[in-house]
């Protein structure tokens, strides 16, 4: 195995590299996401992509985005790849434009719902899907200095094209997805969370005639996700009720996911979106095998209600790339995550928060009902509680399933709740957290076991 101290763009990083987590490379800028890392990632992405052609780069509004994108661009062009810089855009714009223009791949500079001090890199292949695990592994091998690069002609550098004009194509794709549906005069509130959604969401809803109120509607890298957006729905709920709106939509930092609220401020999460949209597709006989694809985080109430409609709910590990893979394998038309990532085969299997919001609002308007009416016809979720426990040690987070006190506590919880409850413990792929989720028909059991298991995680994995 080659152990190269240097690649053509500088020192390799050895074992001190962040790997591809649940959604790309992500971490604190300056300690994890550094210019040196981004330069090397750009170079090795350029080397590893399977086809010829330009590489697209987009970013959310984080202050560090320009640094990350510039370093990635330097690496990509050193690898001989022409770069098209989209500027501020939602994550889904990258894969959609990759396919539209036949690009070799793309990168999105974003840390999604993470705090402003973090940033990250998502990588897409020529098909618009997240890069396959074997190609991610090859990039990581390059970062560690384990790939021989002597056969590459490093004089063949490429150039940079500023391509923010391509966002007009993305906006057209959004509007074409809802066809002739309109929203004339419908009062709607959008929380754009100072992030990527500011590039297109308000324009799209206004083009359809909505009576629009916009919160946090300018790009602001120091406030992205801070007390707003899909991770903090309070401002949206208050604004919807104060303004008498019939619905509201909140996006995360890179706008690949969305959560909604109805006119009373009730939350419509990804499970409800899949159930409601899936029911429409079922009625239209446009849902192969009556199948929806969701993750292990989706609610048991959702699963049982969907099965009562004669449907199949297929579950995957957490991460929209797993949902995507399962949908491709089974031919499913709709899938997603409780957190608000929704993937539709009719829209390229790409999680798009703005598009999902447009679909929900236009479907409601076309049916002559409110989102609240639709929610009333949906399912009753089981009580569910998610507790995030900070565990700084990555090694301990990854080894949680070998912790005997925790395994024993999980077993006790499962035996107590039986078939009317479940426990899910997992290490976050994007943050230094172990997530504990408990759901059951009995809310008191949920509270007891979620708190108890979180305490066991803290005491066992953070012990000196």
From Swiss-Prot:
The active site is at residue 112. GO terms for biological process: carbohydrate metabolic process; peptidoglycan biosynthetic process; UDP-N-acetylglucosamine biosynthetic process. Its cofactor is Mg(2+). InterPro entries: A-D-PHexomutase_a/b/a-I, A-D-PHexomutase_a/b/a-I/II/III, A-D-PHexomutase_a/b/a-II, A-D-PHexomutase_a/b/a-III, A-D-PHexomutase_C, A-D-PHexomutase_C_sf, A-D-PHexomutase_CS, Alpha-D-phosphohexomutase_SF. Its EC number is 5.4.2.10. It catalyses: alpha-D-glucosamine 1-phosphate = D-glucosamine 6-phosphate. It is an enzyme of class 5 (isomerase). Keywords: Isomerase, Magnesium, Metal-binding, Phosphoprotein. NCBIfam families: glmM. HAMAP family: GlmM_B (MF_01554_B). This is Phosphoglucosamine mutase. It comes from Synechococcus sp. (strain CC9902).
């Amino acid at each position: 195995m080659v152990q190269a101290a240097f690649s053509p763009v500088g020192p390799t990083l050895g074992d001190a590299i962040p790997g591809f987590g649940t959604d790309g490379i992500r971490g604190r800028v300056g300690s994890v996401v550094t210019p040196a890392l981004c330069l090397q990632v750009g170079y090795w992405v350029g080397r590893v992509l399977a086809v010829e052609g330009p590489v697209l780069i987009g970013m959310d509004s984080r202050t560090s985005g320009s640094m990350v994108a510039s370093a990635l661009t330097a690496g990509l062009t050193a690898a001989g790849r022409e770069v098209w810089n989209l500027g501020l855009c939602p994550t889904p714009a990258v894969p959609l434009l990759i396919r539209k223009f036949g690009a070799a791949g793309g990168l999105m500079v974003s840390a999604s719902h993470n705090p402003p001090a973090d940033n990250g890199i998502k990588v897409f292949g020529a098909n618009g899907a997240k890069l396959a695990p074997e190609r991610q592994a090859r990039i990581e091998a390059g970062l560690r200095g384990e790939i021989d690069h002597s056969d590459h002609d490093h004089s063949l550098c490429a150039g940079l094209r500023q391509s923010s004009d391509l966002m007009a194509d993305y906006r057209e794709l959004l509007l074409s997805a809802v066809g002739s549906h309109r929203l004339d005069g419908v009062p709607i509130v959008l929380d754009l969370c100072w992030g990527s959604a500011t590039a297109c969401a308000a324009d799209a809803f206004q083009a359809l005639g909505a009576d629009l109120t916009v919160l946090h509607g300018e790009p602001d890298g120091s406030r992205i996700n801070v007390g707003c957006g899909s991770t903090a729905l309070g401002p949206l709920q208050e604004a919807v009720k104060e303004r008498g709106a019939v619905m509201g939509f909140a996006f995360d930092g890179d706008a690949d996911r969305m959560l909604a609220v109805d006119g009373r401020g009730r939350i419509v999460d990804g499970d409800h979106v899949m159930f409601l949209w899936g029911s429409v597709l079922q009625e239209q006989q446009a849902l192969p095998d009556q199948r929806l694809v969701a993750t292990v985080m989706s609610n048991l109430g959702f699963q049982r209600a969907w099965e009562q409609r004669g449907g199949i709910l297929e579950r995957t590990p957490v991460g929209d790339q797993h949902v995507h893979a399962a949908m491709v394998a089974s031919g499913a038309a709709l899938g997603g995550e409780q957190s608000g990532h929704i993937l539709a085969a009719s829209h390229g299997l790409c999680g798009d928060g703005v598009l999902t919001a447009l679909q929900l609002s236009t479907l409601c308007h076309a049916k002559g009902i409110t989102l609240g009416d639709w929610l009333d016809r949906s399912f009753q979720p089981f009580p569910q509680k998610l507790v995030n426990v900070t565990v700084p040690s990555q090694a301990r987070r990854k080894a949680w399933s070998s912790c005997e006190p925790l395994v024993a506590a999980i077993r006790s919880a499962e035996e107590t709740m039986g078939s009317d409850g479940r426990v899910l413990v997992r290490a976050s792929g994007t943050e230094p957290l172990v997530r504990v989720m408990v759901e059951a028909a009995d809310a008191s059991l949920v509270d007891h076991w979620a708190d108890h298991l979180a305490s066991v995680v803290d005491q066992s994995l953070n012990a000196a």
